[in-house]
């Protein structure tokens, strides 16, 4: 099946921020009437403010789930998001912090039995997911504003249901191939993470 949607949002007095700086100056006695900036005394400010012009956002998304078999499915989704600032002279910094394009594609399998007699090879599930995010401008505080580069990662997970003890064991990895990247400007690099869990269902 398929899901599709589109949105268009219209804002007045959109809240963003402006950046300013305060400079303390010292008079230079060697030059009459001249001043120099005292570098240690520069103070930057980030203040919330309303947009002077109309701001609109629009976007669309599509999601697809296709069942190859009762046990297997292919899933995918794509989203497009766009910020429009009408009036190029508006000094506001919108801090939209959203990539224009991104998508996910995954393959999942459920209740898989690789043997009819050996319980060790029964009741398996898995998922493989690919994620792609386009580069975008991240606008935070003055020192944390810049481009977040395009990145892509693969996540995997395998689980087995153990019906005899009402338990499920799971092992997986996010960012399987250790594609070091950051998702916010100024944030830490994110690498591979491997995890496991054992869940008991107590009735």
Language-model regions, residue ranges each:
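Outer-membrane beta-barrel translocator domains and adjoining extracellular loop/strand segments
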Residues: 15-21, 81, 85-92, 119, ...
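C-terminal beta-signal and adjacent terminal beta-strands/loops
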Residues: 131-140, 147-149, 153, 158-203
């Amino acid at each position: 099946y398929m899901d599709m949607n589109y949105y268009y949002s219209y804002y007045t007095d959109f809240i963003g921020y402006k950046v300013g700086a305060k400079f303390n100056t010292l008079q230079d006695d060697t030059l009459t009437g001249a001043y120099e900036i005292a570098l240690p005394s520069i103070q930057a400010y980030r203040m919330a403010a309303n947009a002077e012009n109309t701001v609109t956002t629009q976007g669309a998304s599509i999601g697809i789930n296709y069942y190859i078999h009762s046990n297997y499915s292919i899933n995918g989704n794509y989203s497009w998001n766009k910020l429009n600032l009408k009036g190029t002279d508006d000094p506001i910094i919108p801090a939209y912090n959203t990539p224009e394009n991104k998508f996910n594609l995954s393959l999942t399998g459920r209740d898989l039995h690789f043997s009819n007699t050996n319980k060790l090879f029964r009741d398996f599930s898995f998922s493989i997911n690919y994620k792609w995010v386009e580069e975008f401008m991240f606008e935070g505080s003055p020192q944390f504003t810049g481009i977040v580069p395009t990145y892509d990662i693969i996540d995997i997970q395998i689980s087995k249901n153990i019906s005899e003890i009402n338990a499920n064991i799971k092992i997986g990895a996010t960012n399987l191939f250790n594609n070091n990247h950051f998702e916010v400007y100024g944030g830490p690099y994110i690498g591979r993470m491997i995890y496991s869990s054992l869940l008991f269902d107590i009735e």
